[in-house]
């Protein structure tokens, strides 16, 4: 992604005089900053779809290494102490058989030598698929969707991993619940991101 990016979420910007995308200008978020490898357009969107829905689990190894190569400096600068994948609901996990965000987080963890903590964040509410919803609908759909393990000892700086950042609703909700649990700073990385304005 070579274009000018939003300094908060990393969406590419059309207007080079701006520092923030329209979404980040309008709202205060629960996370500090985030970045993505690519814009969510073909062929990237096709590859992410195959990773997610067509059992192309080995893509996660390649993409996880790519995340480490591209963002190693950023991750070190953020002072990340643990990597947490965005969880799937139990029913979706049973149906799919794997969590693509967890596979990405595992590979990134191995490359960076930072622990992945997968049993921290839980999806306790079965949500409707987000792909056909606007930002407000996504936010309502995700309200109360996540919980944090009561036995977890919160870290100061956490990195959330997901496959796609569209409106940011998933990252927002997950970051909010982690902060309520005592995390000070939440950052995110995703494979791809929607287009900014």
Q: How would you describe each model-predicted region?
A:
Residues 1-197:
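Glycine-rich phosphate/pyrophosphate-handling loop used in enzymes and phosphotransfer proteins
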